Amino acid sequence: MADYLLVVDMQSDYVAVGKAYHEKLTAAVNDKIATYPSDRVIYILNRFFWERKDRKKKFTTGLLVVSSRIFEKRRASCFTNPDLKDFLEGNGAKSIEFIGVDGNGCVKASVLAAVKENYQVSVDLSAVGVANQKRFQNTLYKWRSTGVAVEGELS
């Protein structure tokens, strides 16, 4: 188990009926969240640069929310939020596990940024949504070649 679990972009914008990801992914994400103490779970929400800050972002329906540790990002990597970086450093985090969406987008960018920040990084594929499976093979190769611990299989 890593020091912190980062749940990336599990929000109604991306995970809902008719979207690329649905209830099966939410169930897998919830199962992973349940294995961590609530004070070790961090949620990342994406707010595009053009979106108004006063518009509340919503988690996907049914997501297990066990912590009030919620950080917004406006770019692909969650490490573009200095408050998240300060929180992790201030709490002595050495290792981070990532789950969420999309394996070729924000999860990929955040994982690679965490490696550059010298964290031990792991990803549980059973709780990662990937819209483009073919392209994801390149992502997996990049992760493994940078020392990311990859476990599980895409659901």
Predicted features along the sequence, with ranges:
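Active-site neighborhoods of divalent-metal-dependent phosphate/nucleic-acid chemistry enzymes
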Residues: 91-95, 99-105
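Active-site acidic carboxylates
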Residues: 1-72, 85-86, 90-94, 148-149
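Short beta->alpha junction loops
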Residues: 71-77, 128-129
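Structural recognition of alpha->loop->beta junctions
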Residues: 63-70, 131-155
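Histidine-anchored nucleotide/phosphate-binding helix
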Residues: 27-36, 105-116
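Catalytic phosphate/metal-binding cores of nucleic-acid and nucleotide-processing enzymes, i.e., regions
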Residues: 4, 117, 140
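A short glycine-rich beta-strand->turn/loop micro-motif centered on a GG-aromatic cluster
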Residues: 97-100, 118-133
